[in-house]
């Protein structure tokens, strides 16, 4: 293990909360989320964990007296130029390209227009309006690095996913991330004052795959909204959702795209029923989510797969849900399945555990942090549906499930958005202090 990734080194130098007393607290932050708005419901199109992350961080920064503007691309004609996400948080809908959803691979050609609009918005303010830029995903990082140079303020960037990591773990039917993205990510890595990762695994990937400087990386785990996602009455939730009161309910939540492995969930359901035929009438696989991208045919493919496998009657499809409705699905589930081929963290796994529902997940990426194997859920090596079916079967043991339920809640409680935002604030302060120290040194050298 590289020295900078060792646990003692982390405790000594990389704990961002340690800088919480630093004087360089920003007044205003420009957040950039080009391809998806924090106002969208996760689970459909390009809306997912990134939306949740941006919304939660922005709200909590504002609650600490920091104004936040979130710049995102307008995708509908009826969208106003500005929308209020929360007190102190303004979502600015930037016109860049057609006013409709576009696949992410079509967005790079509109980045110049987007960047120009962001720069114009700042130009109408007094000089030095924004203190920090925080960009999310590589497309936003491309905008952020130009704005950072123009405004002379630090760029903090969160990748959320990495092209090289995704390309190394492609699902069947998926397409590789384009070379343009790989180049763009490398440019952002080189330009950012600080790179925020969800886990140490992601930090290593930035160093090993992109040549990132370790001293500029900060690990800040995301959180879970425990005011919403908390344990509740499972039987009541099942009655509300029309699910069997006594039986096995497997839940999948997420965008319906090969990367997330919804087909593995369907195949695992078929495997489970082949070994537990007596549970046919009380087993349900509930898939909550929508297509990823406006041209996706994944929902139809999954329905056809369920029919081909003879389990169409046991598979229920539901559209993306807002948090206050999604929590009912988590509470109703026996287990949540997360068979992703690549995952930078896995907020779905954390939300499920916070509700007291154990998780069966792939042993990949950030899921190895989001789930404690054998304590809050079960991690599965590879993507063989039979292995997932076997893990689901293990949770039929009342003793094991009760143990995992307790462990799931305890593990989720370690992750809170308030801790995350304190970590992010530490990163901002760190970057601001470094910039201002460098400016002071440059001035002193000229005077000397």
From Swiss-Prot:
GO terms for molecular function: acetylglucosaminyltransferase activity; D-inositol-3-phosphate glycosyltransferase activity; magnesium ion binding. InterPro entries: Glyco_trans_1, Glyco_trans_4-like_N, Mycothiol_biosynthesis_MshA. UDP-N-acetyl-alpha-D-glucosamine binds at residues 49, 255, 260, 321, 343, 351. It is an enzyme of class 2 (transferase). Its EC number is 2.4.1.250. SUPFAM superfamilies: UDP-Glycosyltransferase/glycogen phosphorylase. This is D-inositol 3-phosphate glycosyltransferase. It comes from Acidothermus cellulolyticus (strain ATCC 43068 / DSM 8971 / 11B).
